[in-house]
Amino acid sequence: YAAAKASYAGTDRNSGEWFGIPENEMPPFGVVNNESDLVYDKLGAYNGGWLSGLAYQSGMIGANQANVNDTYYHSAFAEWDQNNQNWYSDSRPDDVGLDVSESGAIDQYDFSFAPNISNRVFIGATIAVTDLNYRMSSSYFENYLYTDNSMDYLDWGNTLRVDGTGYSFNLGVIVRPADYLRLGVAYNSPIWYKMTDSYWGYADTHNENYPEDPDVSGETPASPYPYTNYKLRTADKWIFSVAGIIGQTALISLDYELGNYKYMKLSDPYGYEHYEALNHDLIQKDFGLPHTSKLGAEVKITPQFAVRAGANWRTSPMKKEFREGAFEVFPAVTVAHYTLDKGTISYSVGLGYRFTPNFYMDLACVYRQYKEDAYTFSKVIIEDNNGLHALVDSEAIGLKTNTTQVALTLGYKF
C-alpha cells in the first residue's frame, strides 16, 4: 500500500497522469533528526506523502537500485529464491495484527426558548454550543516467516488528537389539533466547528535482507507535534413526528429523521476551500441522505407507574458503493486504517414512577447494535486512458458492536 501511494502520488484524475515522490525528497533512510522533520514539511505538498515518507524512512519500501528504468517503489520484504537467484515475486506476511484504542466525548450546552400559544401550538428554539474531543492510538504489525526459520517484521504506530468547538441552532413546532393527537416538525442546523488535529506516527522494521543494518526506524516530527487547524460544517437534518394518546392510559409515537450529509464542508481556518471542487465532488459521491425511524409506546399501569418500550433504526450516511469498498479512501496523515458505517439498531425498555406531582424517577435499559467494516488500509485506484485500475486491493473486516446501557434518572418539576 505505501509503495503504491509513493509511486502514484499526485495523481491527476482528469488527465490520467501521475508522478511519484522523488527518492531524493524522501526523509533520510533510518535517520531521525531535524533534517527529516524538514523533509516531512515538504512532503505535505503530495497526496499521501507523509505515510509514504514514513514507510521509506523506516525501511518498509525502497526504490529498485538495480534497474534505473524502474521508477516505482517496492516492498522491502521479499524472500530470496536461491535456486533462481532472484526475489520471489509474491511475499505476503504470515501474521498481521491491528490494535486500536479510542476515547472521546461531545459536550453540548443548550440555551432554549419555548412559547406556548393557547395550549395548542408549541414553539421551541435552541442555540447550542458544542465541545468535541477525540483520542486515537493504534499499532499495526506484520510478521514474515521464511523457509530458513528466520523472521522479519514491521511495526506501525499512530497517535491522533482531535479537538473542536462549534455552534448550531434548532427550531421546532408541535401542533395539537385534537386532544388525542400531536404533530411535530423540527429542523436541526449543521454544527459549524473550528477544529484542530494533531498527530504523530512512528515505524520500525527488522529486515534480514539487509544484514549490515537490519533494524531501521522512523518517526514524524514530534517536538511539537504537527497540527492542522480547519473548519468543518456537519450535516443538518429534518425531524417529523406524530404521537397519539389512547384514552387516559397509553401513548404511541413515531419519529422520522432525514439527514443531509451531501452538503458537509471542509475549509481552512479562514473559511477558504483550497480544493473546493474536489471536496464537493467526493462528499457528493460518497455520502447521501441517511434515514432514522423511531417508534415508542408508553402504558400507565397505575396513575403513578408507567412502562415504556421503543426501537430505533438508523441507516448509514454513506452511499452503497462507498461503504462496500468500491472507492479509494484517503485517511489522515500516517493513519492507514479506517471504518465504514453500516447502520445502527437499538431497542429500549423503561419504567417510570411518579412519587408526587413534582417528583419522579425513570429507569431505562437500551440495547444497541452497531455494524461497520474495518480496513487496515485502502484500495489504491488510478485512472488512465484505459479506465480505472486497482493497484492494491483491501478486504473488509466485518465488525458488530453490541452494547447495553442502564440509566437511572431522578427529576423534580418546579
Each language-model region and where it sits:
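Outer-membrane beta-barrel porins/channels
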Residues: 1-414
